[in-house]
Regions:
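Conserved active-site and SAM-binding loop architecture
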Residues: 1-214
Length: 214
């Protein structure tokens, strides 16, 4: 079945790390985020909008350069939904003095609904990324995990994936001296996708899909 140009949506990605990795391999990948793509990025590959209409496929959209696009169905959807209200680390803010914080709990429910909507994207191959969730989020068990140190990065950052019809990522060049990325970074930078991990995703999952068409 090779070669074939895959139609790929990378949801909630303004860095374009994964989008660029797939593009460099000849695939038709688009990133989508509420924010514009990073300065120096590729606006011709990025659409700034709510991603939910795109998750269903059979969609029309414009990239940041103003060019219209139409996709009947995605081959692969990778999503990075916000983890602010879902992750285990944030659970300490959910209850104060023994009282459930209702506004924060509502935000958790909204975040959970969006996460599940990403997981239910209209594509045969799907991967949703997030850190370890709090029990209160009641997310399904993750399918696998990966770590950037598996691909030579000097930091460790365990990343969970909820997948459909995709194999776990396989370590290639493990960095034995890697240290925790969580302890030396903050905010949005902490949630970044390392280029080495993005390259591994494009290689391993891209090739798997080409070799195992639905």
């Amino acid at each position: 079945m090779r070669p074939r140009r895959l139609r790929i949506l990378v949801a909630c990605e303004e860095s374009q790390a994964e989008c660029s990795a797939f593009r460099s391999r000849g695939h038709m990948a688009f990133s989508c985020d509420l924010q514009p793509c990073r300065k120096g990025g590729h606006p011709e590959w990025h659409t700034q909008m709510d991603v939910r209409p795109l998750l269903k496929g059979n969609c029309s959209f414009r990239t940041q350069d103003g060019k219209p696009h139409q996709v009947k169905k995605w081959d692969l959807v990778i999503a990075h939904p916000p983890c602010t209200y879902l992750c285990k680390v944030s659970s300490i803010h959910m209850v104060k003095d023994g009282v459930l914080q209702q506004e924060r709990y509502k935000s958790l429910l909204n975040a959970r609904a969006f996460f599940l909507e990403c997981l239910d994207a209209n594509a045969y191959f799907v991967a949703v990324e997030n850190p370890l969730p709090m029990a209160r989020a009641e997310l399904p068990p993750p399918s696998c995990y990966a770590d950037p140190s598996w691909f030579g990065v000097k930091y460790t950052k365990k990343t969970l994936y909820w997948t459909k019809n995709l194999p776990p990522l396989v370590a290639k060049v493990v960095n034995p001296d890697a240290r925790s990325f969580m302890h030396c970074s903050r905010g949005k930078y902490r949630s970044r996708t390392f280029p080495e991990l993005a390259e591994a995703i494009a290689d391993q999952w891209g090739n798997y899909i080409l070799d195992h068409p639905p």
